[in-house]
Amino acid sequence: MDNTTRETIQAFLAQYETLAIATENKGRPYVTRVFFVEGPVTESSLKLYGTFITSSRKLANLRENPRVGLFIGPSTPSIWLEATAEASILTDESAIADVREKLGEKSPTAAGFIAQVPTAAVELQVNWLRITNLSGGPVQTEVSFGTEFPGGE
């Protein structure tokens, strides 16, 4: 991955506080939004982190099937990111505290949400992503992180 691609991904992710996550349970899809914070984009990895209400359907679905689809972008898409990822529920208390702190720094709304409800911290290891840009610049930026879950249509 070249520096331009890395910078494109980082700049895109920094603009948004929430993502849409698609989970599945027994063949039934479920899509909802969650607050997220991004880790660094490296040659081999991109991790996103979020908190999920402990009694939520999406968290229960992740326990059964950690493979997810992601969408980040505006309501009227002119530029958007779609991705596949593998979710894991964090158990290390310092890692959980770090996710909550970083979410609060990125989004005051997320901080208020986290303070009001019991949450679990989740790591999303991105396998594949594509940014589509209809407003100028490269139309598509696509990256695979060397995994078995290629994206695309």
What do these predicted ranges mean?
Residues 56-58, 77, 137-139:
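Short, surface-exposed beta-strand-loop junctions and turns on beta-sheet-rich folds
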Residues 1-19, 145-153:
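Extreme N-terminal tail/first-helix region
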Residues 17-18, 67, 108, 129:
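Generic structural signal for secondary-structure transition and capping sites
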Residues 82-153:
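Charged, gly/pro-rich active-site loop segments
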Residues 52-56, 65-69, 99-111:
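Short acidic (Asp/Glu) patches
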Residues 16-54, 60-62, 68-72, 80-84:
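Short beta-strand segments
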